[in-house]
């Protein structure tokens, strides 16, 4: 048992981000209800981050917050806020403003560095992989942070696979697969039998009825092409 009453540790969680592109609360509420109806098991009462970077018109934050919350979604933070007035309103509402990381800025050319001595040892880069060798049953959620996830058995309906990297399923895939959970748009999903309830890469998702019929139940590879999900045969 620890001698300290609390312990702070870094961790990562998979959250959906709601990008607002309209300042009208009723429009937002209806659009969210329509999305939730498409994937209730995935989105109902889900914790979400609200991104406001797409809002140009004056915003009544209290009404917008009520519109999002009225759908059952639980706002855990706000991102993309650069307007000082809106920041004050959000802070008064008791919601945290989240940083999305530093933007890359142009840098002047670095000074020429001295030539390093010859390498005497070859360093091989190793990517971690989480391996699951047993069936993943309904209600189970498996997360592979900062690595790929490989499942060598079946994944039942109602089960959820999440990975920051790629997902490989060498069995019947009936549940939900979310690759690139931390935003890696190069992540992919590989299935030998694709019958998933939901597939997602870096937040771009399909429900089962969006999977092209010619790939349903077949060996398939999913990836992002031109910012949209696409599927290819897995040979």
UniProtKB/Swiss-Prot annotation:
It comes from Enterobacter sp. (strain 638). Belongs to the MinC family. Residues 100-110 have a biased composition (Basic and acidic residues). Residues 98-125 are annotated as: Disordered. This is Probable septum site-determining protein MinC. Keywords: Cell cycle, Cell division, Septation. GO terms for biological process: cell morphogenesis; division septum assembly; regulation of cell division; regulation of cell septum assembly. It comes from the Bacteria. InterPro entries: CAP/MinC_C (IPR016098), MinC (IPR013033), MinC_C_sf (IPR036145), MinC_N (IPR007874), Septum_form_inhib_MinC_C (IPR005526).
């Amino acid at each position: 048992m620890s001698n300290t009453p609390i312990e702070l540790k870094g961790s990562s969680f998979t959250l959906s981000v709601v990008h607002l592109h309209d300042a009208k609360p009723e429009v937002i509420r209806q659009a969210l209800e329509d999305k939730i109806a498409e994937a209730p098991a995935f989105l109902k009462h889900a914790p979400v981050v609200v991104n406001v970077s797409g809002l140009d018109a004056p915003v009544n934050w209290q009404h917008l917050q009520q519109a999002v919350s009225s759908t059952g979604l639980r706002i855990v933070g706000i991102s993309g806020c650069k307007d000082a007035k809106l920041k004050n309103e959000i802070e008064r509402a008791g919601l945290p403003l989240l940083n999305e990381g530093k933007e890359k800025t142009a840098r002047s050319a670095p000074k020429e560095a001295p030539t390093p001595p010859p390498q005497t040892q070859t360093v091989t880069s190793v990517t971690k992989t989480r391996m699951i060798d047993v069936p993943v049953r309904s209600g189970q959620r498996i997360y592979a942070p900062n690595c790929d996830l490989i499942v060598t058995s079946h994944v039942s309906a109602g089960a959820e696979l999440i990975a920051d990297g790629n997902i490989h399923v060498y069995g019947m895939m009936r549940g939900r697969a979310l690759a690139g959970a931390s935003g890696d748009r190069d992540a992919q999903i590989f299935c030998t039998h694709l019958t998933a309830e939901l597939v997602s890469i870096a937040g771009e998702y399909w429900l089962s009825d969006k999977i092209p019929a010619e790939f349903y139940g077949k060996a398939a590879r999913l990836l992002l092409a031109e910012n949209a999900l696409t599927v290819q045969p897995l040979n």
